[in-house]
UniProtKB/Swiss-Prot annotation:
Residues 485-510 have a biased composition (Basic and acidic residues). It is a multi-pass membrane protein. The gene is ght1. Residues 546-557 have a biased composition (Polar residues). Its main location: membrane. This is High-affinity glucose transporter ght1.
Amino acid sequence: MSKTLTITMLLFVSMAGWMFGADTGSIGGITNMRDFQSRFADRYNPVTDTYSYSSARQGLITGMVNVGSFFGCLISSPTTDRIGKRNSIIGFCVIYLIGVIIQVTAVPSWVQIMVAKIWTGLGIGALSVLAPGYQSEVAPPHIRGTIVVTYQLCVTAGIFIAACINMGTHKLYKTAQWRVSIGINLLWGIITLVGVSFLSESPRYLVSIGKDDEAIQVMCKNAELPPDSDIIQTEYKQIKSDCEAAVEGGPCTWPEIFGKEIRYRTFLGMAIMSFNQLTGCNYYFYYGTQVFKGTGMESPYLASLILDAVNFGCTFGGLFVLEYCGRRVPLIIGGVWQSICFFIYAAVGNRALTRKNGTSNHRAGAVMIVFSCLFIFSFAQTWGPAAYVIVGESYPIRYRSKCAAVATTSNWLWNFLISFFTPFITNSIGFKYGYIFASCNLCASIVTFLFAHESKGLTLEEINELYLSDAKPWMSRPKNLSEMAEAKEVEREETRPKGESARYLEHADSNSDSEDLSSSANNDVHEPVARQDPFNENEVEKSRTRPSQESYTTSSN
């Protein structure tokens, strides 16, 4: 893959994560700005000359973006099937930009802000599925993991930069306080939109619709290799085989992901992604400014900025933690660590923060901030990135898109519930809220220990066999997973009706001459997909009589 294209993917596609992070990191500070409160808050205290929100209005302004994200995540799958990932990313970027414009131009009506948040969420939710998926399909295997993780890195970077912008604008005059913080988000959407416009469609999508020649051209361009390269041919054959397997047995339906074979992993993915929110991370990211204001800090914006900086910096550590420590151990240890941090945070806030005379104990407030940072230190390296990695690795090809969509929507659902109900809960029980998150973190560790297998270093086929085996997650995994996966594939091939082999390209000799491949990609007669069948019985029979060095030809529409 050329350096230019690699940098382009990192900068432009990952910027979709920046858009998500920027919205998350900015809303807490914006709702605390005086001009924003004077226009959209529903309570005013003339004695103290301060504005405040009812719990319902605070929760709706903050949380409605997650409602939009929930539905955006669901509609991303059928949209991608129709127009491809690249075009879908472009379309949802436009939706996101429209939502931001509506927010910036809001009149003194909090309903407009709420509706704009829903519209913005449609784009953010869809892009949270599409961007990592596009990267994983276009990037070559040896850098695929690094490129995909940059999405999460950009999420944390967006949160941090949004906190910096809030820090710089909260003292500005009138509407500039919050319009600048919201309006700057247009930049991230425009960067993503322009960058993706110059990228190619995913080779996997092109093969799935029969445009094999175009897919090969994209792979050659990305890898800077000729069509006869072993790398190109191997990748093409794998994609072709995957696409065949994906449609084997017909399109996957929603009820099927809760069938006997896959429901264990479906519910596990939903649990892992739910606990990703129930760790309490967005308690800080959404309401950090208000939380630290309640601890007596003179500059709650600064405290929130410090927390977001820790989150951004520690995400780099997550790249190495998941690579060398696997998935299970970081999630288990991270959950226990985070539980301890929240327990201490809640205990100090509940028992030591407020003195008997009603003043704040600044030392207690400092302790709370320290343990908040320690929580983020762990989350950014464990539950932040690892939850998405587990969901991306756990499902067979045929079920992957729908299972991942269900898991991700559970994440957005809990995201909304926490963002909406947090004002109600904190107004009722204050810092005791931390005990709830401490319990959830402990439960997350237990669920991971009991149900999540270690998938580090395994192929997707081996991971599938691991979950189908009788091995317990806390026991040593079977050493013959590769043989089990191969045996299952052979069994599947033997039971396939004659003439429907999906492994013709996969088992054919990979050391092929480039002439046939190139000429086929450029000179084949293009026929509608429905009328062509390069894997029919005659073709397979012909392939057995060809010299071993003959190249593989491709058909396209």
